[in-house]
Amino acid sequence: MAAPEERDLTQEQTEKLLQFQDLTGIESMDQCRHTLEQHNWNIEAAVQDRLNEQEGVPSVFNPPPSRPLQVNTADHRIYSYVVSRPQPRGLLGWGYYLIMLPFRFTYYTILDIFRFALRFIRPDPRSRVTDPVGDIVSFMHSFEEKYGRAHPVFYQGTYSQALNDAKRELRFLLVYLHGDDHQDSDEFCRNTLCAPEVISLINTRMLFWACSTNKPEGYRVSQALRENTYPFLAMIMLKDRRMTVVGRLEGLIQPDDLINQLTFIMDANQTYLVSERLEREERNQTQVLRQQQDEAYLASLRADQEKERKKREERERKRRKEEEVQQQKLAEERRRQNLQEEKERKLECLPPEPSPDDPESVKIIFKLPNDSRVERRFHFSQSLTVIHDFLFSLKESPEKFQIEANFPRRVLPCIPSEEWPNPPTLQEAGLSHTEVLFVQDLTDE
């Protein structure tokens, strides 16, 4: 019997529930149903999301705002490329640098102290992610207003969704964190990120996700990736079944240099994606083979069940037939027994046979259907019913019959009917002292 909470499920939802439980191995049916309901009963998305959760990757369809972003950044093999700002050149450059140094130091010190003190007054609003997609769209619009519409295609979704799409499609994910207050951000966006050759490389080889660290979603990603300076780029890919940072690019980098660094990172890690594709194909083939085996097993099971059903039906048919034959035999035996008892009763009720010397006696010779003859005497005053009872009591007589006289040829009314409620006597029927009567078999009529 289905559990009460499963009674409102359709047949299709029940099948998806059982299939999801089989694929994920979750024992709790309530948990399976809750997960499917979160994904609008999209079983493919629910299974993928379950696998992502097992590997520590946030959910694509319901990413919790407060959950830390699970990306492997502790790999010591991460390729890191940092571009330092150029040192001042010449007497004029060093003079300008030394003059501005106290002002910059004072400005950034006061700014840091102000931000630190502000945290005690009210929490950093960036720590609460309420609309991550809105943060992405807002940054994209501000980017286009400031630097134009010629830029790499922005991934219009949350960071978690970008990770999951890159994982599902086995593609590189390039993450750009924009520091609005950094002095190199404008030059990088305008001259490097929007360069045609950079746009072409990013759009054809990878997914591109970007956000400002002033936005809650960008700040959350910044806390996970721990950048040191801006502009900051991180290359992420599926490695050892986890989304892993395989490259970090920090500082003001030129277009050609950026292309070279990205190409180097992709070439160095391409084997991991190839290996993952092969493993995924092998898993898919194994799954297809298992599905085919399951289908073959189910087909064989259905065939066996059909055979068993037909056998049961045949056994049931034979049983009913045998039972019907047995009932017919019993009914026939009861009928014969009742018939024999009726014959014996009729025989016991017959009046005594008159003597041959009795002038009122009638000698009747009966010709039975089996060509045998029976002779008996009756009294003229007796009803024709007595003749019928006598013949009925005989072992040779049929079960149903009528008595016919030959001259003139007529049927004697021996049993009550509408025409003869009270059958006549032998004398009233016009019988003589010696008669030959014929017994006509009516059993089959």
Curated annotation (Swiss-Prot):
All residue ranges annotated as the UBX domain in the record: 357-439
Tissue distribution of the protein: Broadly expressed, with highest levels in brain.
Keywords: Acetylation, Coiled coil, Cytoplasm, Endoplasmic reticulum, Lipid droplet, Unfolded protein response
Subcellular location: Cytoplasm; Lipid droplet; Endoplasmic reticulum
Ranges that cross the membrane: none
Coiled-coil positions: 275-350
Residues recorded as bearing N-acetylalanine in the entry: A2
Basic and acidic residues: compositionally biased ranges: 303-348
One MF term in the entry's GO annotations: protein-macromolecule adaptor activity
Main localization category: cytoplasm
Residue stretches making up the UBA domain: 12-48
Quaternary structure, from the entry: Identified in a complex that contains SEL1L, OS9, FAF2/UBXD8, UBE2J1/UBC6E and AUP1. Interacts with YOD1. Interacts (via N-terminus) with UBQLN2 (via C-terminus). Interacts with PNPLA2 and UBAC2. Interacts with ZFAND2B; probably through VCP. Interacts with LMBR1L.
Further facts: Up-regulated in T-cells and eosinophils from patients with atopic dermatitis.
Function of the protein: Plays an important role in endoplasmic reticulum-associated degradation (ERAD) that mediates ubiquitin-dependent degradation of misfolded endoplasmic reticulum proteins. By controlling the steady-state expression of the IGF1R receptor, indirectly regulates the insulin-like growth factor receptor signaling pathway. Involved in inhibition of lipid droplet degradation by binding to phospholipase PNPL2 and inhibiting its activity by promoting dissociation of PNPL2 from its endogenous activator, ABHD5 which inhibits the rate of triacylglycerol hydrolysis.
PANTHER family assigned to the protein according to its UniProt record, in alphabetical order: FAS-ASSOCIATED FACTOR 2 (PTHR23322:SF1), FAS-ASSOCIATED PROTEIN (PTHR23322)
Protein name: FAS-associated factor 2
Organism this protein belongs to: Homo sapiens
Gene (UniProt): FAF2
